[in-house]
Amino acid sequence: MASNDPKNGGGFFASLASSITNFGSAMSKSVNGLMGYEGLEVINPEGSTDDAEEEAGRGRWKQEERDGYWKMMQKYIGSDVTSMVTLPVIIFEPMTMLQKMAELMEYSYLLDMADKTEDPYMRMVYASSWAISVYYAYQRTWKPFNPILGETYEMTNHNGINFIAEQVCHHPPMSAGHAENEHFAYDCTSKLKTKFLGNSIDVYPVGRTRVTLKRDGVVLDLVPPLTKVHNLIFGRTWVDSPGEMVMTNLTTGDKVVLYFQPCGWFGSGRYEVDGYVYNSAEEPKMLMTGKWNESLSYQPCDAEGEPLPGTELKEVWKVAEAPKNDKYQYTHFAHKINSFDTAPKKLLSSDSRLRPDRYALEMGDMSKSGFEKSSLEDRQRAEKKSREEKGQKFAPKWFDETEEVTPTPWGDLEVYQFNGKYSVHRATAENSEDTTDVKLTQFNPWQFQDLSA
């Protein structure tokens, strides 16, 4: 059946298609060849082309640092720089990519509501709002640490959830995550892919995210848009995620398509998200609108995408108040993720909280953080050498690689699945009488050689 897509007519969001089409022109606020640097693009999200050159002199780097980083990074233009470049800790935040995965759990109550409701379209409203909610945290411009192979992150004491993530592959960097409470199970395999463009970088979310709602066994599949990080070296760094997010109910065929508007002149369209919940016949049933850094609302609509008479917009999600003037723009939940308040009893020694480089950066000691980061990277190379000399192969503890290779808009993905061993481990740990202070545990993700010293 052909899609009755209101974007093609005069519906409530008739301008969406042209906004996406004009993405290229909206992003033309740039200066190419600035100061003799060929291919340099600087974009001021709050201005126009007239002040792009002025914008180039802003940002976190001094002029000599900008020049040095530009010369160093030029050779990588067009490349995937996910793990091939050693970067200074000054651009890092005290968090790893595994912890970043856990930030998706902040508003997990929306998945609880999706499981509880009997309305199939409200189910999609709640679930897609959960998927949107993390973008407020994702706008941070600091780089998280790449996890060490075998590194983990555990989280408890939040909405009844047990969360576990593990770095399952080093080249290419791949992470797997699982979270569960009485209402839902979340499973994710992530293999980020990047393209360095000089003063910006495209981040492609190669991955598979599935949520199972336990009451009816409904399975939801999520495909997010790419993310673009602007002004990496010249100008103030900022993040945009233009494009569409699609969440599909694999059980019923219902779906949500939400459009992230690209940032236009003087910030127009920035943060805006609009779209519809469709039934399996691709007929719009609910319109959704809002800003991913503020709130989302919904309203029942007709077949043309227009609001039904007698209905009104209702807010479904609102961003929680964040700390003022936080150095890393952390939310209260991000601080909670970094703390031991969310750590379970008998925390795994491979947990991200225990990384000495991450902790040193959190304490404000960049020199020590840089030293510890280099030390961990050296030990990781030593373990790899030891493993290869012995003819041994790394195997994740809490996830198993399957034979499934799933296509994504940005490339194929090898799928890892939760093997259930962590649930057994956690039950045993919770029944243990061990009262060891987890903060005193030494970080040790190594499997093949005692490299913790």
Curated annotation (Swiss-Prot):
Sorted alphabetically, the keyword list is:
Endoplasmic reticulum, Fertilization, Golgi apparatus, Lipid transport, Lipid-binding, Steroid-binding, Transport
Q: Which Pfam families match?
A: Oxysterol_BP (PF01237)
Asked whether the UniProt record includes Endoplasmic reticulum among its keywords, one would answer yes
**Subcellular location field:** Endoplasmic reticulum; Golgi apparatus
Q: Per the record, which residues fall in region Required for oxysterol binding?
A: 166-175
Q: Main localisation, per the record?
A: endoplasmic reticulum
Q: Where is the composition biased (Basic and acidic residues)?
A: 370-392
Q: Which InterPro entries match?
A: OSBP_sf, Oxysterol-bd, Oxysterol-bd_CS
Q: Where are the transmembrane segments?
A: none
Q: Which parts of the sequence are annotated with region: Disordered?
A: 370-405
What residue spans carry the region label Required for binding to PVA12 and location in the ER?
398-403
The identity of this protein, by name, is Oxysterol-binding protein-related protein 3A
